[in-house]
């Protein structure tokens, strides 16, 4: 049985910011189809920067990024879904309804010039129902709870049927029950729909339970490998520079 082909290849990646600060250095990872990768590290570790490099929003200073076989990232971004940090997603001043927000997610498929057709609107309806938010379709984004908002932005990312899903601390500020539901949805998308996922989060115990691989960053790369080889207490101690013990609590560590 042949080994799964990498859909994202990052080799010797370095990113220096305009102020001269090195945000990332020496990052190497090959992401294969159906991977669910836990991206962990303290604030300022470069997790968001790495995701923005993959999205083509930040240009690397050195190294290469190959997405679905091409170093021209814009060529294949239509296959990538993105869920931003919850603080960005839950702007109370956003004037859009739930339906309009998810419909915008079809842009990579439908394009801006041709407009949305019946097929696009049907896909939006199906996606809203899949994530259990169809009854919220006319509500404004600013009127939603944290958990509802994150389902909407996950639906927006998924409505274009991506092959790779990037999530940047999607559950910060969200209640425990909503977090559990959100991670269960991600787990199903990965296992049942074979969506490749890179998930940045501080919920280390939870995401390392559902992930098959782990990438630890603090500007440089501390660990990258299989979940079964990840020694949480040791690696997290290195990352955060103080002892950490993961405890079991309810359904989550």
Functional labels for PLM-detected ranges:
Residues 140-144, 148:
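Conserved ABC ATPase signature
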Residues 161:
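Conserved catalytic motifs of ABC-family nucleotide-binding domains
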Residues 103, 118-136:
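Conserved ABC ATPase "signature" region
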Residues 55:
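Helix-to-loop junction immediately C-terminal to a conserved catalytic motif
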Residues 63-76:
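Conserved ABC transporter NBD signature motif
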Residues 201-202:
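H-loop/switch region of ABC-family ATPase nucleotide-binding domains
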Residues 165-168:
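Catalytic Walker B motif of ABC-type/P-loop ATPase nucleotide-binding domains
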């Amino acid at each position: 049985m042949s080994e799964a082909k990498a859909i994202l290849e990052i080799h010797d990646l370095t990113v220096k910011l305009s102020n001269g600060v090195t945000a990332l250095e020496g990052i190497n990872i090959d992401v294969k189809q159906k991977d669910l990768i836990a991206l962990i590290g303290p604030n300022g570790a470069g997790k968001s920067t790495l995701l923005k490099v993959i999205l083509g929003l930040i240009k690397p200073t050195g190294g290469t990024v190959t997405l679905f076989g091409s170093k021209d990232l814009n060529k294949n971004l239509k296959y990538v879904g993105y869920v931003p940090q919850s603080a960005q997603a839950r702007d109370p001043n956003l004037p859009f309804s739930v339906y309009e927000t998810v419909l915008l997610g079809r842009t990579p498929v439908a394009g801006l010039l041709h407009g949305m057709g019946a097929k696009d609107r049907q896909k939006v309806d199906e996606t809203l129902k899949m994530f259990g938010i169809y009854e919220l379709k006319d509500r404004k984004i600013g009127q939603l709870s944290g958990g509802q908002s994150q389902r909407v932005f996950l639906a927006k990312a998924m409505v274009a049927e991506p092959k790779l899903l990037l999530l940047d601390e999607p559950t910060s500020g969200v209640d425990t029950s909503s977090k559990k539901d959100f991670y269960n949805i991600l787990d199903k998308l990965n296992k049942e729909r074979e969506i490749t996922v890179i998930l940045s989060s501080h919920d280390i115990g939870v995401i390392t339970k559902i992930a098959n691989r782990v990438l630890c960053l603090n500007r440089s790369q501390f660990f990258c490998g299989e979940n079964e080889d990840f020694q949480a207490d040791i690696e997290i101690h290195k990352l955060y520079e103080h002892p950490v013990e993961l405890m079991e609590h309810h359904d989550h560590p």
